[in-house]
Regions:
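Intrinsically disordered, low-complexity proline-rich regions
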Residues: 1-2, 270
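Noncatalytic, solvent-exposed loop/strand surfaces
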Residues: 18-370
Length: 370
């Protein structure tokens, strides 16, 4: 939420005559920026969408999420990073809960940067400073909590010196829910780079590696025959087996300040990830027994992504590259289909755009609000 107003997004979608659907986490039900199958956008709007309700929103970069007729917002309120549950029908506030003190730097507004999640009767959120909380959906009461810094040895110093990744600009990447696990890029020490918690109790299920956290959220997918969590950490791409955190593969990517923001995109046995400095990589993941190997099938600096996570539609990948250019490339071989100037945006080195796939169309919202 970048501006001062939060609108009922679920009802805005309804004004486009889309079937009702939950959007319970960052980038939607499948965490890939795609609306559920069967939803379509009209060729054009016959009338201006009607604003059903609006409420003031505090600073932050978190997205609201929707489930079961409820909207969960995460913004700065009264000097705290705060969760608020709203009624989707009328915007009425049902409860609010302070999560952590806010964080500010030169890269964005003072407020949370990671998107919360709704899962059944629980909600989950992580603050910029690494305070991870699980609360009851019904009343917002705290169920369990943990601190990336205090409990797991992660570093958080803010915008100081040359410290890279989430330790510098905050924990932006929302953890991923899978089965009974909540898996997070904690960035801790003593093997707590990636940590899987029991989502109901917060108890440790496994921890793995010593990677520092960057900004990209983890995703879960079956790649080369093994179900795994794929993280884009300050050290590069990383694959770990979901049940036990067993190491599978690694692809080193080192950049200044570890500005690794875009979420990994999965296409069969390919993992696509990249940054503004290293470029975009299409990694081929192969299997050798219980281990795997990652090798670049293709790479491109011509369409290096920065803050915006790309989306896949069929055999093509769409994203925002350098100089604010929208691009389309073939995911199989990395061949660029086209690139062109996109929506009105800010400075090229800080521009971002949110891309959502609805049927055969892409919705795009730029940092200029267009």
């Amino acid at each position: 939420m970048k501006g001062p107003i939060l609108m009922a997004l679920g009802l805005a979608w309804a004004s486009l005559q889309l079937p009702a659907a939950d959007w319970p986490q960052w980038r939607g039900p499948n965490r890939d920026g795609a609306a559920p199958a069967g939803q379509k956008l009209p060729a054009q709007l016959t009338e201006e969408p009607r604003v059903v309700w609006r409420i003031p929103a505090g600073p932050g970069l978190s997205s609201p999420v929707i489930a079961g007729g409820k909207v969960l917002a995460f913004d700065a309120q009264a000097g705290q990073e705060t969760l608020r549950l709203l009624d989707a029908a009328d915007g009425r506030e049902l409860w609010r809960a302070a999560v952590d003190q806010p964080f500010s730097d030169s890269q964005g507004p003072t407020g949370p940067r990671g998107t919360p999640m709704i899962d059944g009767d629980r909600v989950y959120a992580v603050s910029c400073r690494g305070e991870l909380q699980c609360r009851a959906l019904a009343d917002g009461k705290l169920v369990w909590r943990t601190s990336y810094v205090t409990n797991w040895g992660a570093t958080f110093v803010g915008e100081k010196g040359a410290i890279p990744g989430a330790a510098r600009h905050g924990n932006n990447g929302a953890p991923v829910l899978h089965g009974d696990l909540l898996i997070a890029n904690v960035g801790g020490t003593n093997g707590a780079g990636v940590v899987a918690f029991d989502k109901r109790t917060g108890e440790l299920r496994w921890k793995s590696q010593n990677d520092q956290a960057a900004y990209a959220p983890p995703v879960v997918a079956t790649v080369a025959g093994i179900e795994q969590v794929i993280s884009f950490t300050a050290d590069g791409g990383l694959g770990l087996a979901v049940p036990d955190g067993r190491f599978l593969w690694r692809f080193p990517i080192k950049t200044a300040f570890a500005r690794h923001v875009g979420a990994p995109v999965i296409f069969g046995d390919r993992v696509i990830l990249g940054s503004h400095q290293a470029g975009l990589f299409g990694l081929a993941i192969t299997r050798d027994g219980d281990r795997q190997e990652a090798q670049p099938a293709w790479s491109s600096k011509e369409v290096a992504i920065n803050f915006a996570s790309p989306v896949r539609v069929g055999q093509q990948l769409y994203g925002l590259g350098p100089a604010k250019d929208l691009f389309c490339l073939d995911v199989a071989d990395g061949k660029i289909r086209w690139k062109q100037p996109g929506l009105p945006m800010g400075a090229p080195d800080k521009a971002w755009v949110s891309l959502l796939v609805v049927g055969d169309k892409i919705l795009a919202l730029s940092d200029a609000g267009v």
